[in-house]
Amino acid sequence: MSKIILTGDRPTGRLHIGHYVGSLRRRVQLQNTGDFDEIYIMIADAQALTDNFDNPEKVRSNIGEVALDYMAAGLDPEKSTIFIQSMIPELTELTFYYMNLVTVSRLQRNPTVKAEITMRNFEASIPAGFLCYPISQTADITAFKATTVPVGEDQLPMLEQAKEIVHKFNSIYEPVLVEPEILLPENEACMRLPGTDGKAKMSKSLGNCIYLADSPADIKTKIMSMFTDPLHIQVSDPGHIEGNTVFTYLDAFCTDEHFERYLPDYKNLDELKEHYKRGGLGDMKIKKFLNNVMQEELEPIRLRREELAKNMDYVYDVLKKGTETVSYTHLTLPTNR
């Protein structure tokens, strides 16, 4: 069996570092290992319309922005096929058929769907398309016979429901659908990076994001205003690591080499944490260190993005060719014939 990756993002805005550590960075690593036969990266514009149906221009205009972020972060069109979901009508067709395998009550019990409904204030009037989001994801995964799906922790219930649909389809008809393996981020901090304000989720709508395209000045401003430990008032006070956003970000981005370059008084993050917990280490010092780490990580991405943005014709040509490749060459709906 071919080893195939499918993953993607909804084009509702530029990508932020939550997307980056949650999935995008891992995609680039997997792409460059050469261990997979095919890697498909989907810009899920059709799914984005399920809660942006009254603002299609927002979705349309952000397709190019997401593609810029992809390539700036290191996704190579020669190694990964980047395509636009809405241009593949077979995915919508398969979604329709899979709807017969899932009850409305099961969709409503999906923890991710429930959380998203609450966040968007859809409780009184849930769009049917939004409720069927997990079914659409299942169609995407199975149409490409994906064996591996890199996701953030918040998407786990979606993938579990996809597996349920695969099992039911295979038991009713024939075992032709591939059940995908779930690939989570490398550590707990990367699974669900909190917003800069300490809230549980980094979200465009909450204004608590650091974007891949942010300027150095914007990144620094956001880091310096980040939530830390409200009880750590004096430098001498013992501090708490748990729930401290600065340390969560360091867990996601920091390596021992960063200490050699920017904070040589410490060998690694464990030593820094122990000093903070004892007291005698100020929030400003760790924020300055985080700023150095983040600037180093994001600068090459930002510079590549700025260069790519000078030639949007090339960016859209990549999307056109990727979508054509999927449409005419690789996409095969499930069959045993």
Region roles according to the model:
Residues H16, E271-L281, E299-S327:
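Short His/Asp/Glu-rich catalytic/ion-coordination signatures at enzyme active sites or charged loops
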Residues R26-Q29, T33, I165-I172, T332:
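Active-site catalytic microenvironments for nucleophilic, acid-base chemistry
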Residues K114-Q295:
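Active-site cores that bind ATP or allylic diphosphates and position pyrophosphate for catalysis
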